[in-house]
Curated annotation (Swiss-Prot):
Coiled coil: none annotated. SUPFAM superfamilies: FAD-linked reductases, C-terminal domain, FAD/NAD(P)-binding domain. Belongs to the FAD-dependent glycerol-3-phosphate dehydrogenase family. Its cofactor is FAD. Disulfide bonds: none annotated. InterPro entries: DAO_C, DAO_C_sf, FAD-dep_OxRdtase, FAD/NAD-bd_sf, G3P_DH_FAD-dep. One of its GO terms (molecular function) is glycerol-3-phosphate dehydrogenase (quinone) activity. Pathway: Polyol metabolism; glycerol degradation via glycerol kinase pathway; glycerone phosphate from sn-glycerol 3-phosphate (aerobic route): step 1/1. The lineage of its organism: Bacteria, Pseudomonadati, Pseudomonadota, Gammaproteobacteria, Enterobacterales. Its EC number is 1.1.5.3. There are two sn-glycerol-3-phosphate dehydrogenase isozymes in E.coli: one is aerobic, the other anaerobic. It catalyses: a quinone + sn-glycerol 3-phosphate = dihydroxyacetone phosphate + a quinol. This is Aerobic glycerol-3-phosphate dehydrogenase.
Amino acid sequence: METKDLIVIGGGINGAGIAADAAGRGLSVLMLEAQDLACATSSASSKLIHGGLRYLEHYEFRLVSEALAEREVLLKMAPHIAFPMRFRLPHRPHLRPAWMIRIGLFMYDHLGKRTSLPGSTGLRFGANSVLKPEIKRGFEYSDCWVDDARLVLANAQMVVRKGGEVLTRTRATSARRENGLWIVEAEDIDTGKKYSWQARGLVNATGPWVKQFFDDGMHLPSPYGIRLIKGSHIVVPRVHTQKQAYILQNEDKRIVFVIPWMDEFSIIGTTDVEYKGDPKAVKIEESEINYLLNVYNTHFKKQLSRDDIVWTYSGVRPLCDDESDSPQAITRDYTLDIHDENGKAPLLSVFGGKLTTYRKLAEHALEKLTPYYQGIGPAWTKESVLPGGAIEGDRDDYAARLRRRYPFLTESLARHYARTYGSNSELLLGNAGTVSDLGEDFGHEFYEAELKYLVDHEWVRRADDALWRRTKQGMWLNADQQSRVSQWLVEYTQQRLSLAS
């Protein structure tokens, strides 16, 4: 039986971040994901790298300070999929007085180490404003946007770059301690093939399933309860042409974002609803749709109805149960629990956490694991660049360089490659000299060469992996085009299997 230094169960942002950090410190690492990378909470976020302005109201200064500092780090680590964005906050005096917002924004500007992002300012909305005429004043501040699912993917690629192993569609079925080691058993969810490994340490980063894996996978008591809080978003055709996002205050003291997305759409979200069901079956409720439309329509001149919605997505945040009364008051901070057996076979479990602070969470996890590994390397991720991030400049400059090297690329395709694959675009394009070298076009300039790259280098096995997580081509491809992608994947997988045998 093969022995690993560390097995990480869960292929969301926290699992991938911990696995990448550990592999880079010289540990032999295996990451197991039961379905697809980022298939649950990590692809259902608001897609922001943000300090969390509203968390200041709950006195979460440590969390906000850490998150603010991380924005600058992540912009450097993944400049192809993360970029700065300005946020406009319409002032509604009966909800929060201007002095309170000014204090909050002053703290937001100064709590974290801000080197590249501009500070906050006051605003007056004139006649040309997209907001209703009664909204005359507001504020503007900086945060960042990120492609959440691709941030997970880049970390998984880093695991492999640093010598680790990543298996998707491989479900960990049990883990037990034996003679100072973990015995981990898993099965391939497609073929039923069984695997087992030994490991010196184990990480439970299963997100919404963290407590369930304690109960069913390890038959151990979970050190903390978990509260599942559902967050849903609606997507509509772009509601305005400005680059800025809007952060809207609502009567219930919650906030809702309106975020420009992929040049053609706006994301509106999120909700905060206690959730008791199966995390895999999570979907938006009618009441959430009405809530989000109502908050939006209260603020904007351009009104929206249900018919404008082109897509919705929902996810559950697995938050550590701190017995708060309301979903929005529960801490978004993370809790790491570690325990061992006679100084060996540590189990580190992740409760809670945010996309923005995943790298610090991973660093803290490795601090807790370090005493169990002789000769483990030091922290290293703060100065690293994730796979695809070596674009030397900004994304649009890189897209222009791609077009010079591959003159047959349209502007839109070069931009898509630059903003999706970054410096890995050249691996995708290889020696292509004409557009016909890219193979079949499945629709919306989604060519065979891209899909082949996704299978060979990004763990894509099913159409959803390619169309809704590695890319968002599902927003444009119709049902027939999507089923052609599925068919191609089956044929290509069979071809690879016959070559391998």
